[in-house]
Amino acid sequence: SHWIGGMGVLVFILTLLPLAGGYHMNLMKAESPGPSVGKLLPKVQSTAKILYKIYIALTVALIILLLLGGMPLYDSLCAAFGTAGTGGFGIKSDSMGSYSLYIQIVITIFMILFGVNFNVYFLLLTRKFSQALKSEEVRCYFFVIIASALMITFNVRHLFDNVWEALQQAFFQVGSIITTTGYATTDFNQWPAVSRTILVLLTFCGACAGSTGGGIKISRLLLLAKSVRKELHLYLHPNAVKKIKMDGKAVSHEVMRATNIYMIVYLMIVATSIFIISFDEFDLVTNFTAVVTTLNNVGPGLSLIGPTGNFGIFSPLSKLVLSFDMLAGRLELFPILILFLRETWKKF
């Protein structure tokens, strides 16, 4: 079901924009309520067909590679579905920890691939290589992964037999967290504070827009960073006219407004959720990471809910709050929040 859910959410999101003319027309058109689905119906059908082909092809390729590595068929299917949909449900208590190095490396690669904007794959299939390589989001995505993995490797190298094992474990956990898959090969809850902090920051970061991953998304963070840079520039040059651009194209005021509103709502949900579950009297790290990991659809957190823990410790009320966070995060906040508006129910 999480394999179907991963693709279902992706198609639902991308049916809200014209794929061919827009190529990831800046995050918010792809991930917030936008153009009428009816007007886009012909493109929606062709888009869904292309996306399903890419999604299924990557999933089949992963299953084959896992089988070649000696993983049983049932395990391969479960692992591939969990990786593709970034659901991360494992059939073993140690997640992916007991599988071979080959299996772990293959899953690492495919977790990262499923976190890439699927529009990039479409551009590659249509041989628009230069346009695909110009994607600021994808370049930033890979930069964050590599930089984070290298920093963690340096920080945890003393915990492993050699630096290569530390590097492999770092890349696996970074790939798992940033794509919101949630697999684990080791108890990173025991890692040094620096490494755990990096993983928490990656939980917020999330994968690319138009992927099966969750989180805030790289594109939103890029737009926010560009917005801050623009404001600083205007402080120095009040009369300057400076436009925010993504992939060489100017970003509209509507997109920036939607991005800012998303972040405000996101922070409000985080603050409210932490406050409510704090009545369970668990430590701040447990409460904070519980909210962050559920809202971003990652899975494991830190402290009492690390890779070897679970959410069974929370009260029924807290579980309801965290369940709401999971649904809201997976649906990009606004679709589920609309259900709480009186105007929504007056239409039925």
Where are these regions (language model features)?
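Membrane-proximal intracellular helices of multi-pass ion channels
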Residues: 1-348
